[in-house]
Amino acid sequence: MGLAKETTMGGRGRVAKVEVQGKKPLSRVPNTKPPFTVGQLKKAIPPHCFQRSLLTSFSYVVYDLSFAFIFYIATTYFHLLPQPFSLIAWPIYWVLQGCLLTGVWVIAHECGHHAFSKYQWVDDVVGLTLHSTLLVPYFSWKISHRRHHSNTGSLDRDEVFVPKPKSKVAWFSKYLNNPLGRAVSLLVTLTIGWPMYLAFNVSGRPYDSFASHYHPYAPIYSNRERLLIYVSDVALFSVTYSLYRVATLKGLVWLLCVYGVPLLIVNGFLVTITYLQHTHFALPHYDSSEWDWLKGALATMDRDYGILNKVFHHITDTHVAHHLFSTMPHYHAMEATNAIKPILGEYYQFDDTPFYKALWREARECLYVEPDEGTSEKGVYWYRNKY
């Protein structure tokens, strides 16, 4: 694994190099006002990229769910395989089904952005169905995620994976800054991080009172949004009760093998994808004195997940474009990304480090944020790792 090293150049708006051993150095995202506007970026994108086709979007749902069903049918034949192939078959199924259902999760996420079709009610019905099946409170998360898009990169108002300044880092964090502590932290984050965020707002924006995606009166939501939280909760209760009935008929072990472990993999990938999109030593964060929407939207990182880019419907390698134009359907996002890259220039960031290496590297290098020493840019924060 390559080692990261920063080279800093003085002056406002400077571009520091972040060197990764064996790779071309990545430049820090400039923190000055971009020399282009959102309107100019939109004009560079072919108009058809903004068109949402109901038929095309549904074709991806059918495609993913068809393969999910095929994978499930395959499990009914595992008992016919000789040892040890029957034991090997289950982990293969878990990985394949987990990756595929992550793609389903992404489509539901797209529904929440009104990027699935021209019809809001269709998007919400499809999104509610798909997300509830994956135990996600659709409307509850849609609302908080919308706020994330409105406040990306803001240390004061962003909703998730908000880094802390060194002075606010937990006292025990320095004792986890070693390979064993890092491995344990990642294991916990990837396995229970997502449900802990939904239930208790762990790693989310701090609020003055209890914040939970299941609580209609949580401070995350306004009065006019509370009914939607109830709808999400009822949908989740219905799915949970259905799973309980399945467990009584087929057994808990069967349910965990067919549904539980793939869902665990979905949750792990979701945390990985989100974390790596917004955590990188080349990305700035801003306090209220420096933040604006466009600078925050550009403080995101496109990543390369290999063949999984396609399985995950390119949420991984077109995330910059997604933050700029979130109602654009995923099947046009790559074309749009290629169209705006020449305009974005050094404001566009792409890291092709394999995601599993990047996850470990970022967990080691990106522990807290601080402004650069000796500069006037006190509202621009960069990742550090030295206690």
Swiss-Prot record:
Look up keyword Lipid biosynthesis and say if it applies. yes
Which GO MF term does the entry hold, naming one?
oxidoreductase activity
Locus of motif Histidine box-2? 145-149
Record InterPro entries = FA_desaturase_dom (IPR005804), Fatty_acid_desaturase (IPR012171)
Q: Give the EC number.
A: 1.14.19.-
Q: Which UniProt keywords apply?
A: Endoplasmic reticulum, Fatty acid biosynthesis, Fatty acid metabolism, Lipid biosynthesis, Lipid metabolism, Membrane, Oxidoreductase, Transmembrane, Transmembrane helix
Q: Where, by residue number, is the motif Histidine box-1?
A: 109-113
Q: What is its main location?
A: endoplasmic reticulum
Q: So where does this one cross the membrane? A: 54-74, 87-107, 121-141, 183-203, 227-247, 251-271
Q: In which tissues is it expressed?
A: Strongly expressed in developing seeds.
Q: What biological process terms from GO does the record include?
A: unsaturated fatty acid biosynthetic process
Q: What class of enzyme is it?
A: oxidoreductase
Q: Where in the cell is it found?
A: Endoplasmic reticulum membrane
Pathway info:
Lipid metabolism; polyunsaturated fatty acid biosynthesis
- How does it sit in the bilayer? Multi-pass membrane protein
What do the Gene Ontology cellular component annotations say? endoplasmic reticulum membrane
- Per the annotation, the residue ranges of the short sequence motif Histidine box-3 are 319-323
What family, per the record?
Belongs to the fatty acid desaturase type 1 family.
Q: Give a short account of what the protein does.
A: ER (microsomal) omega-6 fatty acid desaturase introduces the second double bond in the biosynthesis of 18:3 fatty acids, important constituents of plant membranes. It is thought to use cytochrome b5 as an electron donor and to act on fatty acids esterified to phosphatidylcholine and, possibly, other phospholipids.
Q: What is known of its domains?
A: The histidine box domains may contain the active site and/or be involved in metal ion binding.
Q: What is this protein called?
A: Omega-6 fatty acid desaturase, endoplasmic reticulum isozyme 1
